[in-house]
A protein has these predicted regions:
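Alpha-helical transmembrane segments and membrane-interface helix-loop junctions
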Residues: 1-204
Length: 204
């Protein structure tokens, strides 16, 4: 298996998980709209809407982290970074992943696992509603999200190593984009295909 295939495989996993949990937005919208209707029109509020909102939002926030990382979409202060040559960018990012990213993610997995196990052992429920909605399932998502982030972090480190060796950042999987960005991707692909066709040894 090539490095590029491995990178795309990890990216695809993060993408699939991110897309799956994106449906939480639809459920949140429908649930919140229903709560507003029954509360203010029928004067009959639900006992579960608040718990549903923070559980689904928490799950969405946690499980979309690896997807955002695979898209290089996390917020960064790149005013100086983008001016650096690719190899310098790769070295800097590799150092930051080793000394800052992975210690934080490992702490998230370790602490999140203990937190989730304690919650599951006592059968923790929400104190915000009279029906006692179970919330230990949400806390199990914390170490799972950390594991996905760690896996995607490995892919990003491999990208850094490839960039240091070749002087170019490896391509990422294309996904839903704004039209302008999609056009830029298409132009880059056409340029890359034209470059490959012009390599020595090709039949003309």
């Amino acid at each position: 298996m090539s490095i590029q295939s491995l990178l795309h495989g990890i990216d695809q996993l993060s993408k699939s998980v991110g897309h799956a949990f994106a449906w939480c937005i639809v459920i949140l919208t429908l649930g919140t709209s229903y709560e507003v209707f029954v509360r203010y029109v029928l004067n009959d509020p639900t006992s579960w809407a608040f718990d549903m909102s923070y559980i689904l939002y928490g799950a969405l926030f946690l499980m979309s982290g690896a997807y955002a990382l695979s898209r290089n979409a996390h917020v960064r202060g790149d005013i100086f970074f983008r001016l650096m040559p690719p190899r310098v960018q790769g070295r800097l990012e590799l150092v930051l992943y080793i000394f800052f990213f992975f210690p934080g993610v490992i702490a998230l997995m370790y602490s999140g696992w203990s937190y989730a196990m304690d919650s599951m052992r006592i059968g923790e429920v929400s104190v915000n509603s009279p029906i006692g909605v179970p919330i230990w399932q949400l806390k199990l998502i914390i170490p799972a999200a950390g594991a996905l982030l760690a896996l995607q972090g490995v892919a990003e480190m491999l990208r850094c190593i490839v960039c240091i060796r070749t002087g170019e950042w490896p391509a990422r999987l294309h996904d839903v984009e704004e039209m302008e960005t999609e056009i830029l991707h298409q132009l880059e692909d056409e340029k890359r295909m034209g470059h490959d066709a012009a390599l020595p040894g090709d039949s003309k």
